[in-house]
């Protein structure tokens, strides 16, 4: 089977599979803040992220998942050569050149999905968690900043800060569903410091010290949000409304998770409030890039 054939059917999450990105989230709600002539490119980036993550979240055997993700990396080669073979890479063809999307960041999205598919994200070492959030969150924000016209070093640094904070927050949000699917994003160092020794990911959810294990992750997310806020004025003006809205929405989510405490892991993950997100989009539209 050719690489492009495999990539053309990357696999989707099965009926019982865990997926954290299929639902409407703050990134989708903030899309109206992307200029109309760039919105299709932003949607193409988000669609690519969803396609590769669907492979990792699907019910296929691990070797098959990793084979499909390897095929997606080959499909990126085809995209660069001007020969995309899948709907999502065809949609990326014009944005790749028009907005100078960094190929390495598209590949980072695939590598993050491969970490999920390969079983790395089960109580990973802190260094692996940091790498994962850089590849999944950092890459995504850097790509979206490029779509919005900023490929500068400052935008890259901002993207790394916001991407890490955003991804740590959504990992905490999805802790319950992920654990029930056999994943656990909490770093082993935090689990050890909290005194959690469990035979399964599901047992971690019931442990009375769960809040203590989550606290360092939440603290890092909060610190990186603060870093991103400090860096935002260095980002190009047209990119700021969208990126500011994404930052604020995820900061709000982190506060909600903190208020819910241990219950956040056993209750359904909170979704962004539609009214609040819509109000934020309107506010940033009128506020502009200031």
Model-derived segments and spans:
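Catalytic cores of Mg2+-dependent Asp-rich isoprenoid enzymes
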Residues: 1-166, 172, 176-290
């Amino acid at each position: 089977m050719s690489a492009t054939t495999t990539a053309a059917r990357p696999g989707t999450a099965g009926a019982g599979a865990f997926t954290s990105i299929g639902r409407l989230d703050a990134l989708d709600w903030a899309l109206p803040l992307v200029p109309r002539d760039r919105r299709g490119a932003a949607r193409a980036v988000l669609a690519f992220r969803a396609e590769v993550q669907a492979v990792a979240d699907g019910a296929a055997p691990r070797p098959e998942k990793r084979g499909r993700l390897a095929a997606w990396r080959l499909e990126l080669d085809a995209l660069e050569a001007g020969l995309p073979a899948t709907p999502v890479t065809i949609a990326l063809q014009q944005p790749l050149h028009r907005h100078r999307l960094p190929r390495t960041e598209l590949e980072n999205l695939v590598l993050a999905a491969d970490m999920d598919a390969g079983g790395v994200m089960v109580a990973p070492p802190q260094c692996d968690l940091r790498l994962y959030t850089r590849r999944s969150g950092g890459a995504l924000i850097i790509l979206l900043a490029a779509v919005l016209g900023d490929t500068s070093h400052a935008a890259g640094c901002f993207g790394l800060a916001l991407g890490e904070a955003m991804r740590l927050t959504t990992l905490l949000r999805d802790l319950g569903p992920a654990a029930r699917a056999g994943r656990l994003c909490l770093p082993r160092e935090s689990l050890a410091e909290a005194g959690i020794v469990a035979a399964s990911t599901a047992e971690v959810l019931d442990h009375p010290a769960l809040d203590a294990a989550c606290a360092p992750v939440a603290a890092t997310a909060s610190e990186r949000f603060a870093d991103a806020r400090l860096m935002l004025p260095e980002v190009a003006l047209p990119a700021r409304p969208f990126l500011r809205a994404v930052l604020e929405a995820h900061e709000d989510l982190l506060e909600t998770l903190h208020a819910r405490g241990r219950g956040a892991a056993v209750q359904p993950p909170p979704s962004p409030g539609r009214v609040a997100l819509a109000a934020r989009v309107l506010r940033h539209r009128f506020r502009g890039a200031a």
